[in-house]
From Swiss-Prot:
Localization per record: Nucleus; Mitochondrion
Key word Acetylation present: no
Protein's name in the database: Large ribosomal subunit protein mL67
Keywords: Mitochondrion, Nucleus, Ribonucleoprotein, Ribosomal protein, Transcription, Transcription regulation
Taxon lineage: Eukaryota, Fungi, Dikarya, Ascomycota, Saccharomycotina
Protein family per UniProt: Belongs to the mitochondrion-specific ribosomal protein mL67 family.
GO cellular component, one term: ribosome
BP term (GO), one: mitochondrial genome maintenance
InterPro entries: Ribosomal_mL67
Originating organism: Kluyveromyces lactis (strain ATCC 8585 / CBS 2359 / DSM 70799 / NBRC 1267 / NRRL Y-1140 / WM37) (Yeast)
Gene: MHR1
Classification via Pfam families: Mhr1
Length: 219
């Protein structure tokens, strides 16, 4: 099965591991609109667009899959594949609540311009990335007991928000780092994400080996 076909479906934990992916979740930011896309993979397709944007409107149009207008905003390394699937699913559920179930309430809480519309500059609405960060924090709070085993690689320090105000009080042991990059080049970003994936798989294998050794000793 080609990589492109593989990412057009939701994938369970066992499949991700067998296919050679790392236990990660990816957040991509649209450079033109500010919208954020969630993916189980270091890339995305129309499938992720359809899943993430189920109730598009003129303020929140269904975005294009053009790779040059998307930039990786964050990569989350999880301790195992089940948790990576759980975080991805919860992010998608929270997006559905914001865009469909409680769309009016969500819009009421957003910063408005003089016309009463969600504030924007040109086509860019910063509220979408802010909401994505808030939702990610909410999802990781569900894994508070294993927070020291979770690492979030951010596009930059500014993107995560105020660490002392929003993160440390509730997730003090969560690991934060920033993505190493020289510029906004898709090929370079792809290489960085591939390297992060390899590191995450190595860490997963190392932890499992330690757990297996500890179990053998206890027996």
């Amino acid at each position: 099965m080609s990589k492109h076909l593989a990412i057009t479906k939701f994938r369970p934990a066992n499949w991700l591991q067998k296919a050679g992916y790392a236990p990660q979740v990816f957040l991509f930011r649209n450079l033109e609109s500010g919208q954020v896309l969630y993916s189980q993979f270091p890339t995305f397709s129309w499938k992720q667009i359809d899943t993430n944007f189920q109730r598009p409107n003129w303020e929140n149009k269904k975005p294009s899959t053009r790779r040059d207008i998307w930039k990786c905003m964050a990569v989350v390394d999880l301790p195992d594949y089940d948790k990576s699937v759980k975080v991805y699913q919860n992010l998608c559920r929270l997006r559905y609540l914001r865009d469909v179930t409680f769309s009016k309430q969500a819009k009421d809480m957003r910063k408005k311009n003089e016309s009463g519309h969600t504030w924007y500059s040109s086509q860019y609405r910063p509220t979408y990335s802010q909401e994505a960060v808030a939702d990610l924090r909410e999802c990781l709070l569900k894994l508070k007991d294993v927070q020291s085993s979770i690492k979030v690689h951010w596009e930059d320090e500014w993107r995560m928000g105020d660490k002392e105000k929003y993160w440390n009080p509730v997730l003090p042991e969560l690991n934060h780092t920033t993505l190493e990059r020289l510029g906004n080049v898709s090929r370079e970003e792809s290489a960085i994400l591939k390297e992060l994936g390899e590191r995450a798989k190595e860490e997963f294998a190392r932890v499992r080996q330690q757990e297996s050794a500890a179990q053998n000793i206890s027996l």
